[in-house]
Swiss-Prot record:
GO terms for biological process: L-arginine biosynthetic process. Its EC number is 1.2.1.38. GO terms for cellular component: cytoplasm. This is N-acetyl-gamma-glutamyl-phosphate reductase. It comes from Campylobacter jejuni subsp. jejuni serotype O:6 (strain 81116 / NCTC 11828). Belongs to the NAGSA dehydrogenase family. Type 1 subfamily.
Length: 342
């Protein structure tokens, strides 16, 4: 028997990837596409490549007969929309940032709004499947992680958990394809602006910083602060992070490889690459995999960690489906058994 799901925000890039994955999921039926601006429009008119003959509607959510609702909506939207009564009717996976951070003050500082739903904020489960699998299985509200945060946390988590690095020395240099900026028309995202150009943005102010720090602090069991700098690169999709940290002791590469293997050997979507094989975005494109590898610089006593994901899949829609699979006791990789087409 298939579960019935709905999507708010299916017109965006992450929303469209969600539709694409769910259409091929054997245990899911897409029953509702919600929109306030495209009511009556057929989804195929918006995305002719997508075989979904379903029109957008604008119903009161309390009227919907769904098992699960995905929210691929702008920040602040779901924080105002969700309530306990709705969560008694259906499960929710929120792809926005509205329920990712536990401290309400972080929303005022980083997102510039006062969170209106602080009780639900505390009850939401952070949907990074490889770290919080058991909590996700029991959750009614899952906050799907951000794209940069997914790649950064997964790449560094074992090092923080084992406390083998100087936490105050961590620097993350991240690069993302343009789809990470969303589908809305913006001058800075036009072809002539991004083609043959790489630029940094959000210096010391990117909104994913507190999310990364929060969950690596949980791993370290102490408050940590790190440096995170993102860059926009002229490709459609993909994230590559290069992270640097000082080692606390004289460790060899095999020592660190043993640590990563300890944490990730049983995970279906994390691939610890062989020695000397460095992650590339094309190897994870359109897949739910996270590729990770590292090198130890014996001269500087630093570990250099590389991680790669597809920002729209493992960084958004694929991870949302992975969360759904856990919440409904499906195989974790159901509907996600695809890999990069080189």
């Amino acid at each position: 028997m298939k579960i019935k799901v709905g999507i708010l925000g299916a017109s965006g890039y992450a929303g469209n990837e969600l539709v694409r994955i769910l259409l091929n999921h054997p245990k899911v039926e897409i029953s509702y596409l919600g929109s306030s601006s495209s009511v009556g429009q057929n989804y195929q008119d918006l995305y002719p490549n997508t075989p979904l003959n379903l029109c957008f509607e604008n119903k009161n959510l309390d009227e919907l007969e769904l098992d699960l609702l995905f929210l691929a909506t702008p920040h602040e939207f779901s924080a105002k929309l969700l309530n306990e009564n709705l969560l008694k009717k259906m499960k929710i996976i929120d792809l926005s940032a509205d329920f990712r951070l536990k401290n309400p003050k972080d929303y005022e500082l980083w997102y510039k709004f006062t969170h209106p739903n602080q009780e639900l904020l505390q009850n939401a489960v952070y949907g990074l499947c490889e770290l919080y699998k058991e909590e996700i299985k029991k959750a009614s509200l899952v906050a799907n992680p951000g794209c940069y945060t997914t790649c950064s946390i997964l790449s560094l988590y074992p090092l923080f958990k084992e406390k083998i690095i100087d936490f105050n020395s961590v620097i993350i240099d991240a690069k993302s394809g343009v789809s990470g900026a969303g589908r809305s028309a913006k001058v800075e995202n036009l072809f002539c602006e991004v083609n043959e150009n790489i630029k940094a943005y959000g210096l010391a102010s990117h909104r994913h910083t507190p999310e990364i720090e929060e969950h690596l602090s949980y791993a370290a069991k102490e408050k940590i602060t790190l440096q995170f700098t993102p860059h926009l690169v002229p490709m459609q999709r993909g994230i590559l992070i290069s992270a640097y940290a000082n080692l606390k002791e004289d460790l060899q590469e095999q020592d660190i490889r043993d640590i990563y293997t300890k944490y990730y050997q049983n995970n279906k979507f994390i691939r610890l690459l062989p020695p000397q094989s460095l992650p590339q975005t094309r190897w994870v494109k359109s897949s739910n995999f996270a590729d990770i590898n590292f090198s130890v610089d014996q001269r500087t006593k630093r570990v250099i960690v590389l991680g790669a994901i597809d920002n729209l899949i493992k960084g958004a829609a694929g991870q949302a489906v992975q969360n759904m699979n856990l919440m409904f006791d499906f195989d974790e990789d159901e509907g996600l058994k695809f890999f990069a087409n080189l």
